[in-house]
Amino acid sequence: MINFHAKRAENKVSRKAHAIINNNFCPLGHLNMLNIQQFIRDHVTGRQQSMFLPDIQANTTKLTQEIKNKKVLVIGGAGSIGSSYIKAVLPFRPAQLIVIDLSENGLAELTRDLRSTEGMYIPADFRTYTLNFADSIFERLFRENGGFDIVANFSAHKHVRSEKDKYSVQALLENNVIKAKRLLDLLTEIPPQHFFCVSTDKAANPVNIMGASKRVMEDLIMAYSDRFPVTTARFANVAFSNGSLPASWLDRLSKKQPLVAPTDVKRYFVSPEESGQICMLACMLGKSGEIFFPKLKEGQMKTFSSICDDFIMAMGYEKKNFDTDAEARRFASEMPADSKLYPVVYSKSDTTGEKSYEEFFVEGEKIDIQRFTSLGIIEEVKIRPYAEVDKFLEELQTLFCRADFTKADVVEALKHFLPTFEHEEKGKNLDQKM
């Protein structure tokens, strides 16, 4: 019998929590008791077990059939979602696992994590490589390996802050779309049995360039759905994932810096474990061309400020509100190590690209909510002709070759391709805030 829990050994203290304890500033001595996973269950998702566990258990035979003794490639596997996907897949005993990521340190930690987890199955052929999947060395690896049965791509720009100027916008679209096409073209040489590429809820009625890039990515992979099976998933924020606002609170505590959060931005949340499971279910059980999403109710959305309130209490503090960043920084720099108050700055969102709410599907998309207990599916997705998508990508690359192109030019090009894209430029980005 597959042990779904053996793949996840819960450290009582997160790696970042250890860093805080070892720092000169140890908040009240309470942090060494922090269990991040339990905090997520109690205060973020409100679920004591994964919402996807019933569907995994109900489909164990099928999942085993699709994964056991197969060759698996995970691109961007050192990140939060990619590593969680790996932990979800390994109990089904693939014959080979190759992980690609640009983060050498991340791959080292992934390997240590897997090999330090009690009960974790690791195939004899397990390899990690620090390289770009758009490089020629990756193409050589792919061909000499004889391709892969399962390919999952988690390499992406995921932050709304990635649209601050023309350079960041070009990098975002190069990575999320143009390089993704290069990968898809390579896969046509030795087609996989399953191809999965992660999307985002922000692809539904996008209001920022990151979300728009993911919507284009969806159109792109669907254009290949007649060449090999492709699926994707739009899902919620991953609680305390790398680079997320909640994860940054741990860093701020370690450096004795204020905590910040928007009061008017509501988000759905899944745990890191759940993020990998939804991707595995979509990848292995989906029909080509389908888009998956978690069946979460509107009432389950939470504001970051409410989560921050609970986090501060869990750390043994009382929050002290400040109206300005400067006031909060000053208080933080002067507060004693045994302070029972901790500075926070809560404010309404005022930066470009922030969407006040989340949605997984839009009007006109055909939804199936019966097939799985925890997952909804957008089926019969309208597939844009390959030539149409390819033409748009060529137009983007031509635009990027112009020395005088602007961010506004890119927005207009995206609006032409995505009529539902409603971008509002506010002249302020997240890099200008704490």
Where are these regions (language model features)?
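Short, low-complexity, charge-dense intrinsically disordered segments
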Residues: 7-13
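Non-catalytic terminal and boundary segments that flank Rossmann-like NAD(P)-dependent oxidoreductase
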Residues: 21-71, 419-433
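Strand-loop microenvironment adjacent to phosphate/nucleotide-handling motifs in alpha/beta enzyme folds
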Residues: 62, 221-434
